[in-house]
């Protein structure tokens, strides 16, 4: 399944808003830098109509080596989570389902 890249996002900004290509790329880079910086400071990032990004700490837990069956400890870690906002969920539900290409 294709994915939207930062370069494609910058190109779409160039086409839709009329910024030059350099400004579009800089804007996309700055946006993601600001999101990452806020998360690194422990702040949630809430984008109205889109969703929320936040850092969550996962507790340590026992894991299992699939080859040997040996129990191994999995360290505590921090992960980024995204929760889609109501408007985004609604837009996705309103879209007609398109079958994925094989």
Swiss-Prot record:
Xref: InterPro entries: Hist_DNA-bd (IPR000119), Histone-like_DNA-bd_CS (IPR020816), IHF-like_DNA-bd_dom_sf (IPR010992), IHF_alpha (IPR005684)
SUPFAM superfamilies: IHF-like DNA-binding proteins
Domain of life, per lineage: Bacteria
Residues forming coiled coils: none
GO cellular component: cytosol
Keyword Transcription in annotation: yes
Stored CDD domains: IHF_A
Disulfide-bond pairs as recorded: none
Pfam family, any one: Bac_DNA_binding
GO biological process entries: DNA recombination; positive regulation of metabolic process; regulation of DNA-templated transcription; regulation of translation
Key words, A-Z: DNA recombination, DNA-binding, Transcription, Transcription regulation, Translation regulation
GO molecular function: DNA binding; structural constituent of chromatin
Role summary: This protein is one of the two subunits of integration host factor, a specific DNA-binding protein that functions in genetic recombination as well as in transcriptional and translational control.
UniProt record similarity statement: Belongs to the bacterial histone-like protein family.
Subunit structure: Heterodimer of an alpha and a beta chain.
Name of the molecule in the record: Integration host factor subunit alpha
Gene from which this protein is expressed: ihfA
